[in-house]
Curated annotation (Swiss-Prot):
Catalytic activity: 2-formamido-N(1)-(5-O-phospho-beta-D-ribosyl)acetamidine + ATP = 5-amino-1-(5-phospho-beta-D-ribosyl)imidazole + ADP + phosphate + H(+)
NCBIfam families: purM
EC main group: ligase
Record keywords, A-Z: ATP-binding, Cytoplasm, Ligase, Nucleotide-binding, Purine biosynthesis
Family per similarity comment: Belongs to the AIR synthase family.
Protein's name according to its UniProt entry: Phosphoribosylformylglycinamidine cyclo-ligase
Domain of life: Bacteria
GO cellular component: cytosol
UniProt organism field: Clostridium novyi (strain NT)
Entry-linked Gene3D superfamilies: PurM-like C-terminal domain (3.90.650.10), PurM-like, N-terminal domain (3.30.1330.10)
Keyword Iron among UniProt keywords: no
Length: 331
C-alpha cells in the first residue's frame, strides 16, 4: 500500500521538527500569550491600551536564502525574517506583539528547520515579541533538495494618537541615520550575480558569512526614543535603498537632502561597487550602511544621536528635509 512517506512527506520528521521548534518558541512568550503552541490558532490578549491600533507587516528574506543554502547556515536568516517585519511596523511607532512564521521545503530536515526557528526565536526576543504560531510545509518536488523558503508575519500595537505617519514633518527637519549591520536582506540577486564563490576571503572571513550577517533589529532603541522625543517620521531602508524608502515617510511634498560623506559606508558595499556597480545604483539598491532613518526637529538631533549611541548603535546626522518635490537628493 502507498504511504505519505512514499510520496516524499515524512510525518515523523515533521513531529520531531515541531517538538524542537516548540522549545524555541516558548522562550519568546510574553504575558499577552494566553494559549500554548499546538492549538489551531495563536491567541494574544490586548490590554492596557486606551485606543489601540493594530499594525501588521509581512515579509521574507528573498534570495539571501540562496547563500544560506550554499553555506549550510540556517539560523541567521530566521533573524532576518523577524527583522524585516518588525522594523517595518516600527516605522509607525508600533510595538511588536506577536509573530508567525512560514517555512516551506522539498524535504524536511528537522534539525535544520529547528535551527531556522531558533533564529526566528532570537529575533523575536530581540524585538520583544512572541512567536505564537507558524506553518512548516513539506512539499516534495516543489523545491530542490536542500532549498526552502521562509516568510513571516507580525502584529504590533500603537495608541491611535501616537501613530507616526509623517504628518508632523516640516521644512528643515534633520534626518538621522542609524547604522546597519551590512547588506541586511535586500539586493542579493545583484550580489549573487557579482559574487560566485562564497568561500573567498574578505578581510579574514569567508565572504558568504559576511553576506549572511543578520539584519539589525531597531525595535528596542527606537521605542525608547519615542518615549523621550517627538519623532516626526521614520523609514526602514530596505529594497530600493535611499531613493525608494525615505520618501515613504513623507505625507506632503518634501525632498530628503542626503550628504553622502556624513556616514561610514561599510567595506562590503565598496567591494560590491568595485565589481562594476555605479554609485547611484548602489544607493537605489542597498542601505549603504544606514538601515533606519529618523526625521526629527533640528534642536533634538544631537541629543537623539547621543542617546542612540548610548544604546549601543552608531548614528549620524545624514541630511535634512526641504519643502517641495518628493524624493531624495544625494550630495
Amino acid at each position: 500500500m502507498a504511504t505519505y512517506k512514499d510520496a516524499g512527506v515524512n510525518i515523523e520528521e515533521g513531529y520531531k521538527a515541531v517538538s524542537l521548534m516548540k522549545n524555541y518558541a516558548a522562550k519568546t512568550f510574553t504575558k499577552g500569550v494566553i494559549n500554548d503552541l499546538g492549538s489551531f490558532a495563536g491567541m494574544f490578549e490586548l490590554s492596557g491600551y486606551k485606543t489601540p491600533v493594530l499594525v501588521s507587516g509581512t515579509d521574507g528574506v528573498g534570495t539571501k536564502l540562496k547563500i544560506a543554502f550554499d553555506m549550510k547556515k540556517y539560523d541567521t536568516v530566521g533573524i532576518d525574517c523577524v527583522a524585516m517585519c518588525v522594523n517595518d511596523i516600527l516605522c509607525h511607532g508600533a510595538k511588536p506583539l506577536f509573530f508567525l512564521d512560514y517555512i516551506a521545503c522539498g524535504k524536511l530536515e528537522a534539525e535544520n528547520a529547528a535551527d531556522l526557528v531558533r533564529g526566528v526565536s532570537d529575533g523575536c526576543i530581540d524585538a520583544g515579541c512572541s512567536l505564537i504560531g507558524g506553518e512548516t510545509a513539506e512539499m516534495p518536488g516543489f523545491y530542490k533538495e536542500g532549498e526552502y523558503d521562509v516568510a513571516g508575519f507580525c502584529v504590533g500595537v500603537v495608541e491611535k494618537d501616537e501613530i507616526i505617519d509623517g504628518s508632523k514633518i516640516e521644512n528643515g527637519d534633520v534626518l538621522i541615520g542609524i547604522e546597519s549591520t551590512g547588506i541586511h536582506s535586500n539586493g542579493y540577486s545583484l550580489v549573487r550575480k557579482l559574487i560566485k564563490d562564497f568561500n573567498e576571503d574578505f578581510n579574514g572571513e569567508k565572504i558568504g558569512n559576511v553576506l549572511l550577517t543578520p539584519t539589525k533589529i531597531y525595535v528596542k532603541t527606537v521605542l525608547e526614543l519615542i518615549k523621550k522625543y517627538n519623532i516626526h517620521g521614520m523609514a526602514h531602508i530596505t529594497g530600493g535603498g535611499f531613493y525608494e524608502n525615505i520618501p515613504r515617510m513623507f505625507k506632503g511634498d518634501f525632498t530628503a537632502v542626503i550628504n553622502k560623506g556624513s556616514f561610514k559606508v561599510p567595506e562590503i558595499f565598496n567591494h560590491i561597487m568595485s565589481l562594476g556597480v555605479e554609485e547611484e545604483h548602489m544607493y537605489n539598491t542597498f542601505n549603504m550602511g544606514i538601515g533606519y532613518v529618523l526625521c526629527v526637529k533640528e534642536e533634538d538631533a544631537e541629543n537623539i544621536i547621543r542617546y542612540i549611541e548610548k544604546m549601543g548603535s552608531k548614528a549620524y546626522k545624514i541630511g535634512h528635509v526641504e519643502a517641495g518635490g518628493h524624493g531624495v537628493c544625494l550630495k
